[in-house]
């Protein structure tokens, strides 16, 4: 007789072979689990535990995945995992009958079963279900990783999110919070009488942001098209058309680098409100993020990237000139000459990008970008950006070198970007042409010229406030995730060879 070898001691390939043989045997008996089409259940693990006092002794039906099996004599204890958590099953030969119990003993960890039984507590006070009937609903042909105690290799976790969710149930909470955040944000805007809309993902011009686009080809039209890098320009066309409050939650695609805060495919919300300005957008940004934290987490206090963050309303607001003066020691408000500004930046170790014009505005922004962002831990609105880096933004009436723009920073991460939108088509054309010149100098992230958008503006666009918020980063903030991949179910990964 062949020696019995526990599956845990078998090689991976041997375990797979044994599972396939068990499936073949079931099918030969006319018990193919894959022919099961439905299982009616009336309970789940969380509800049973939460309502034990009223459910004790009651008959229940539940379904889930077997995550452990202990004791293989006449009694077996198992952990059943469903969408709400785990609960112990008490499986006894006297309850199932010898024939069914022997079949049950052949079930493997990872198999999906339906259970009918009675709620009770064991002698050790563990809330459990005494199984009266166990039905195999799906056979797992592959064993769970690392002896089912968890999957820790991040590369495998992100490539096989289905296994990650299976063996690391806490991972699901990130995506529950993500769903709740999007729901909160949608309700917030709907209650302000915004209309949710959908705009094209494929466009003949990539506009609305400074980013390198993905390019694809439309076979029927025989033209190259760009996957959207923002939803700004089509949404502003709707403002021109008389839809005074619009927003879109959707995927954005940017053919750029990947790091803990960036994924080429990400989700944002963009919103535009006629007869409003960037101050109104600040209030909405603060209201969404702080309000979501309070509703979803029950607190304004969160921990992210090793920092304790207070999201309570009343966020700090400072101009870029003020921020650079405080953290870099240069008062750009006292400088008017381009060469002097560039020299002052260089003296602090700040270099302008090769493709950037050597101007006061570019020097101010370079100082902020390279020296200030790292200091912005608590929620802060940085306002009044240079016109050079804000091609779609209304100029400041007080200083035409600056624009009515803000970015929201938390823990040195940009969370949102908003403007008093530029509605002067003549000024907009001039700024587009500056962007075209930058592209010609080698900046492939500069804006493209969009003649149709300019045409729309020439019909008259009301004063408008607009904003974009990165949903993935907001979820990182609320969950404490240290990488964007933890809050995207299927992050972009390089294929394995």
Task: Name every feature range the model reports, one short phrase each.
Residues 1-497:
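Class II aminoacyl-tRNA synthetase catalytic cores and aaRS-like
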């Amino acid at each position: 007789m062949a020696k019995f070898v526990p599956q845990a001691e078998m090689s991976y390939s041997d375990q797979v072979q044994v599972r396939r043989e068990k499936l073949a045997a079931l099918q030969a008996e006319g018990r193919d689990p894959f022919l099961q089409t439905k299982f009616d259940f009336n309970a789940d693990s969380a509800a049973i535990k939460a309502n034990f006092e009223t459910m004790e002794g009651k008959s229940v039906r539940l379904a889930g995945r077997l995550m452990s099996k202990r004791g293989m004599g006449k009694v077996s204890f198992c952990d059943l995992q469903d969408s709400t958590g785990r609960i112990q099953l008490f499986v006894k030969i006297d309850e199932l009958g010898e024939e069914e119990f022997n079949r049950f003993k052949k079930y493997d960890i990872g198999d999906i079963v339906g259970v009918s039984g009675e709620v009770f507590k064991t002698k050790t006070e563990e809330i459990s279900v005494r199984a009266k009937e166990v039905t195999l609903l799906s056979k797992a042909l592959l064993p769970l990783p690392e002896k089912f105690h968890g999957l820790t290799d991040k590369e495998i976790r992100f490539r096989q999110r289905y296994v990650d969710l299976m063996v690391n149930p806490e991972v699901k909470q990130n995506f529950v919070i993500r769903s709740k955040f999007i729901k909160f944000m949608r309700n917030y805007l709907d209650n302000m009488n915004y209309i949710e809309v959908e705009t094209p993902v494929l466009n003949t011009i990539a506009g609305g942001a400074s980013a390198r686009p993905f390019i694809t080809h439309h076979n029927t039209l025989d033209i190259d098209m760009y996957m959207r890098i923002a939803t700004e320009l089509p949404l502003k066309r709707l403002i021109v058309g008389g839809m005074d409050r619009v927003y879109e939650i959707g995927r954005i695609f940017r053919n750029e680098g990947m790091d803990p805060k960036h994924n080429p495919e990400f989700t944002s919300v963009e919103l535009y409100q006629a007869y409003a300005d960037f101050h109104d957008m600040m209030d909405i940004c603060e209201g969404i993020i702080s309000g979501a934290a309070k509703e979803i987490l029950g607190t304004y206090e969160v921990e992210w990237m090793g920092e304790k963050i207070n999201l309570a309303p009343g966020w700090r607001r400072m101009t870029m000139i003020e921020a650079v003066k405080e953290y870099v020691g240069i008062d750009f408000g006292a400088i008017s000459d381009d060469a002097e500004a560039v020299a002052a930046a260089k003296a602090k170790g700040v270099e302008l990008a090769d493709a950037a014009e050597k101007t006061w505005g570019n020097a101010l922004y370079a100082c902020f970008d390279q020296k200030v962002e790292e200091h912005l831990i608590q929620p802060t609105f940085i306002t009044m950006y240079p016109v050079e880096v804000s091609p779609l933004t209304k100029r400041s009436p007080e200083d035409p070198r600056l624009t009515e723009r803000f970015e929201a920073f938390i823990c040195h991460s940009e969370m949102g970007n908003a403007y008093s939108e530029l509605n002067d088509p003549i000024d907009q054309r001039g700024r587009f042409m500056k962007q075209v010149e930058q592209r010609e100098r080698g900046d492939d992230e500069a804006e493209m010229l969009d003649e149709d958008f300019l045409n729309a503006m020439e019909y008259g666009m009301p004063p408008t406030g607009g904003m974009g918020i990165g949903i993935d980063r907001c979820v990182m903030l609320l969950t404490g995730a240290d990488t964007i991949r933890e809050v995207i179910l299927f992050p972009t990964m390089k294929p394995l060879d």
